[in-house]
């Protein structure tokens, strides 16, 4: 339940000192525009309803919103590289994968397997402290070695097939565990780049 609420997610990261953004606060706490921020729904997933507020005029227009449903989060510009990660915990089994990605309209179309001990350690810490039983999607950005986790989604993400093809088969492991109590073995993840494309087919 913690990760269904983006402000609770921020508080969890802050409390446990795990690469949290500078701020993720209810919109109604901001009385005057000062610096750019991302506008997000407090509850929700994906990039739907995200908007960059970078002028006083845009901020003024937010008066129309039900502010208790919205939040402001630190803005990351294009200097930051974006990563999508998955961590899975089933009984004593914990494993994770880190993918550097490129987006098109909010969807990952390119991903590259990355080895980063700091991120892997943080993912394990999140899984252990939250007493995870299943899979989490963790999104973060990095610039000048500064890591910032801006989203944690308690669900299978749209990169599930990419991960599967790379050897990280969290969806299958999850199903096998809950149906058959089968504990996965440590995966051999392919150190590859992967591209998602659309195909045209006759119907």
PLM region spans:
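Short gly/pro/ser/thr-enriched loop/turn and capping motifs at secondary-structure boundaries
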Residues: 1-3, 104-105
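Active-site nucleotide/adenylate-binding loops and adjacent lid/helix of ATP-dependent enzymes
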Residues: 2-80, 89-93, 117-121
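A short, glycine/Asx- and small/polar-enriched loop/turn
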Residues: 32-35, 143-148
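Protein kinase-like catalytic core scaffold
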Residues: 37, 94-95, 148-151
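Short, electropositive, low-hydrophobicity segments enriched in small/polar residues
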Residues: 48, 171, 184
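ATP-dependent carboxylate/phosphate-activation module, predominantly the ATP-grasp catalytic core
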Residues: 54-57, 67-69, 74-131, 135, ...
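Cysteine/selenocysteine-centered motifs that mediate thiol-based redox chemistry or coordinate metal-sulfur cofactors
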Residues: 137, 181-203
